[in-house]
């Protein structure tokens, strides 16, 4: 499982020009989490990802999402598992198929909510437009 976590002051995701998820957090900051589920991920990788999103000290003042009750915008992104070593077209064979990935993304969202974290989401499998105001910029790649 891979995720790109970006510290933001606001972020939104739209489908067909309709906002389906948004966070606005100019005081605490928040996290835009682009998460890709891999075909070879372990059954409990989602739990590690929940801990990383909640507890990494990547917000202002070395605080975590849990420390300051910051919101998370969670967006599924299978393209994080694209392989580009050969040719001119990425291979997506390392990404989990949709029927496997979608419930894992839901487990991540639920796991964050169970920690009291506000979670907004994109729409799985949809063509989305993601807008964000990055802080820093501060972006990390998480693999688990």
Swiss-Prot record:
Predominant place of localization: cytoplasm
CDD domains according to UniProt: Dtyr_deacylase
UniProt keyword annotations, A-Z: Cytoplasm, Hydrolase, RNA-binding, tRNA-binding
A GO term from the CC aspect: cytoplasm
GO molecular function: D-tyrosyl-tRNA(Tyr) deacylase activity; Gly-tRNA(Ala) deacylase activity; Ser(Gly)-tRNA(Ala) hydrolase activity; tRNA binding
Placement of sequence motif Gly-cisPro motif, important for rejection of L-amino acids: 136-137
GO biological process: one example: D-amino acid catabolic process
EC number: 3.1.1.96
Family as reported in the entry's similarity comment: Belongs to the DTD family.
Protein name: D-aminoacyl-tRNA deacylase
Provenance organism: Corynebacterium glutamicum (strain ATCC 13032 / DSM 20300 / JCM 1318 / BCRC 11384 / CCUG 27702 / LMG 3730 / NBRC 12168 / NCIMB 10025 / NRRL B-2784 / 534)
């Amino acid at each position: 499982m891979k995720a790109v976590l970006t510290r933001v002051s606001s972020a939104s995701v739209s489908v067909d020009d309709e906002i389906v998820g948004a966070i606005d957090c100019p005081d605490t900051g928040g996290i835009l989490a682009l998460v890709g589920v891999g075909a070879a991920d372990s059954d409990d990788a989602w739990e590690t990802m929940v801990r990383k999103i909640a507890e990494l000290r990547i917000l202002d003042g070395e605080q975590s999402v849990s420390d300051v009750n910051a919101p998370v915008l969670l967006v599924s992104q299978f393209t994080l598992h694209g392989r580009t070593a050969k040719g001119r077209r990425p291979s997506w064979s390392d990404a989990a198929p949709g029927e496997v990935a979608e419930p894992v993304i839901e487990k991540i969202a639920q796991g964050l909510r169970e920690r009291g974290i506000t979670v907004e989401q994109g729409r799985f499998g949809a063509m989305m437009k993601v807008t964000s105001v990055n802080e820093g910029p501060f972006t990390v790649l998480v693999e688990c």
